[in-house]
Regions:
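Short, solvent-exposed loop/helix junctions and linker helices
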Residues: 17-20, 101, 137
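RNA substrate-binding interface of SAM-dependent RNA methyltransferases
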Residues: 1-91
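Active-site/ligand-binding-proximal alpha/beta "capping" segment
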Residues: 85-135
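Structured adenosyl-cofactor binding patch, chiefly the S-adenosyl-L-methionine
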Residues: 31-33, 46-60, 117-154
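Glycine-rich loops and low-complexity Gly/Arg-rich segments
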Residues: 36-39, 62-66, 89-92, 109-112, ...
Length: 154
């Protein structure tokens, strides 16, 4: 994992993402937003599955991919010189108020469970995306895209 981080910028770390459509959409959005790459933590779906490749519209071949266990990612966060921004429903900070300057890792959790307590503990900032309507959360790929484009404002 350390070898991938020779370039600064924004990395996206995905913890236990299961849906290949979500992963492909995140890959496509990360490519469009010029993210430095994607870190797949623990048991993520295969980025080279037919559905993920299709959803990525081929962006899977343009984005640097790294695989890490939760333990490896945790060890990496201890020496990482940048921010780790995680999204979590219980967070009190609005994503628009976060410090999105590089270098940073955007840490996104599993579709059903979100970020584990362990992963939240690795974050230098925890943010939420406010829900104005009746829905209590957004699709993982949509939430990731919103955060990536907020990062582009910096």
């Amino acid at each position: 994992i350390n070898a991938c981080f020779s370039s600064a910028g924004c990395w996206v770390a995905l913890d236990r993402v299961r849906d290949p459509g979500n992963l492909g959409t995140i890959l496509r959005t990360a490519d469009a937003a010029a993210a430095a790459g994607i870190i797949l933590i623990d048991d993520c779906t295969d980025p080279y599955s037919v559905e993920a490749v299709r959803a990525s519209m081929g962006a899977v071949f343009n984005v640097c991919l790294a695989q890490a266990t939760a333990s490896e990612f945790s060890n990496f966060c201890q020496i990482w010189q940048g921010s780790v921004i995680g999204t979590a429903l219980p967070a009190s900070n609005d994503y628009r108020q976060a410090d999105w300057s590089s270098p940073l890792v955007l840490l996104m959790g599993n579709e059903q469970a979100g970020l584990s307590e362990e992963m939240m503990g690795l974050c230098t900032q925890l943010v939420r995306l406010p829900m104005k309507g009746r829905s209590d959360s957004l699709n993982l790929a949509v939430a990731t895209g919103i955060c990536l484009y907020e990062m582009l404002k910096v």
